[in-house]
Amino acid sequence: MSQQQIVIIGGGFTGTALAIHLARAGQAGLQVTVIEPRAQLAQGVAYGTTDPAHRINVPAGRMQLAGDEKGVFDRDYRASPGFRADPEALWHDGNVYPQRGEFGRWVNAQFVHYQQHSPVKLSHLRDSAVAFKNGVVTTASGQQIHADQVVLAISHPPPDLPALLRPLKGHPGLIANPWQRDALAQVAPDDRVAIIGSGLTMSDVVASLHRQQHRGKITVFSRRGQLPRANLSGSFENYTLDYGQPQSSTARGWLHRVRQEVKQAAALNLPWQLVLDDIRRNGQRIWQSLSLHEQQRFLHHLRPWWDVHRYRIAPQVSQVLSQQQASGQLNLLAARLIAAESDGATLRLTLRLRGGQSHMLEVKKVIVTTGPAHNALLNSNALLRQLHGDGVIQPDPLALGIEVNALSQTLNVNGEANPGLYVAGPAARGRFGELMGLPQVAEHAESVARQLLNALSLPVSERCPGSLTY
């Protein structure tokens, strides 16, 4: 049997999960190569952090590589030295919220396990892909790899500096990318800090500053001034909406539906989080039922509210935010930046508050936490620039990532499918909508794995149970 090769470009969680699913479902005769410059896989933006203040945002029992593995990581983590060394991971309701690096290491361990036990030949090439033409992937070191199928598992480009801050680029008080290792080490304990953005990245930053005993005033601002909600404490049965009834085809209609469902749940003494969780589980189907115009309306009007309710934070982190707000150390504003200048080591920001008033800030550090620049994804590395420049791939109409079809195949500039070039993970969310949370990313990786095996006409075996241990 001739060897066939699938090349996965990007070895964060998405690419590593895809490789594991291929190893589980594939058979002898298949080579899977993950191109990722980091020494270990599954160490992307989310799970590559080494800061112990950064915790998984949901209980460990909900972290898995496949839907039928609920509780496996939780079991393994509780038996690990990491759990014994981190008593704060155990919340009072009995759930555990590990440091995020623990999950990344666990996923990497699964990859290593399948390298040793799967009939599929798995390999990790520590390099970066810079071009893909005529079925050949070229790497930064000059290697050329023949690929029958290529998957782009490139999810999170670096943050983009807001236009008003670009003249300050390079100023020691401007922290443009808080994801960089030791980026916050330069914040002195008494520094006054401004944080632009109030989502998950901001929550990580505040938790990190708290861990390093920062005591200066922190001003957090975003246009709507909304913080991520805390995750649900306790154990509840799933709440299920009735999808058998006629469904709305508009963003406004779904907003009304969700509000009604939340009221009904409250009448049963059930928390609103259960309603949002069911919407999330069915989010891809709902998203694809909306027209492009309605999807655009959702992103413009409702996305900020969806994000703070959908992407919730660990209770340990929520507790830090609440305590700092109560003490007056942290102040949250609904505002936008209208001017910025430097005066030596001091940075002066002018904000426009939601009511129209101006507000001046003088700080020592400005930290940008507006998240990945997904609208600039195709310009974020050499490979994507080449593919885009050649007309092989194009951005999706919503500027969320890369345009794909229902099979996750990329579409060229003429709207035609590239049968040998796929996207896995969040970069495909323009098509699928709900594709940022780990359960959905893992499910998408499993779906793409089966698409790849079917496209290569390879037999697909029933997924073998993994040895899901460290």
What are these regions (language model features)?
Residues 76-77:
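Glycine-rich, highly charged phosphate/nucleotide-binding loops
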Residues 48-73, 236-252, 316:
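N-terminal glycine-rich dinucleotide-binding loop that anchors FAD/FMN and/or NAD(P) in oxidoreductases
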Residues 51-67, 71, 81-105, 109-111:
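Dinucleotide-binding Rossmann-like beta1-alpha1 core, especially the glycine-rich loop
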Residues 1-45, 88-246, 252, 256-456, ...:
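Flavin (primarily FAD) cofactor-binding/catalytic cores of flavoenzymes
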